[in-house]
Amino acid sequence: MADKLKIGVIVGTTRQGRFADTALEWFEPKIAARTDLDYEVLDLRDFALPMFDEAAPPAAKPVTSPAAQAWEKKLLEFDGFIVLTAEYNHSIPASIKNAFDYAFKGWYRKPLGTVGYGGVGAARAVEHLRMIAINFGMVPVRGATTIGGADFVAAMQGKPASEWGDHLDAPTTEMLDDMVFWGNAAKTAKG
């Protein structure tokens, strides 16, 4: 049997009162139950990345910011990523875009899964993130988890996940299965 994949679960919003903590609390038991992968939570709050101000993109030249160097080094530890994202003004939060802009090798040829949340389940943000990921040579997986509409409202009202999240188990399992498939395919191809 192949080594377990190591997946970075990125908490993508950094604002006070963020819903990301609720989404992570719901999602983490799902990924923790998997026997075919390991994971680590990467909270963007913990990396203190400055706004991107490098002379060239990381694909062309190594970054100079010590925080960005630590970020890229951390990303290199993983076989794929799942980003928990809100939708801000029909797109991803600036914190996620900035985190992508500060790295290249850490993202390259790895699968990307998403857990989106908001009024429409962050559908537009998820699609935008998938387009960004392709630019980094990533494989955005088909499966996705979207916490939207009535589910999002119920969660915001503090209702337990058992009242709003059980029907999200199937798409979450599909996304995690896709992550394992594409993560193993990428590892095999890279040798």
Describe every region a protein language model picked out.
Residues 1-85, 91-98, 102, 159-181, ...:
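N-terminal beta1-alpha1-beta2 submodule of the flavodoxin-like/Rossmannoid cofactor-binding fold
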Residues 2-3, 107-109:
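Short, flexible coil/linker segments at domain boundaries that flank nucleotide/cofactor-interacting
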Residues 85-86, 111:
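Short, proline-centered helix/strand-breaking motifs
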Residues 89-90, 121:
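Glycine-rich nucleotide phosphate-binding loop and flanking beta-alpha elements
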Residues 103, 107, 133-137, 183, ...:
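Short, well-ordered alpha-helical segments in soluble proteins
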Residues 108-154, 166-171:
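Short, glycine-/small-residue-rich phosphate/pyrophosphate-handling segment
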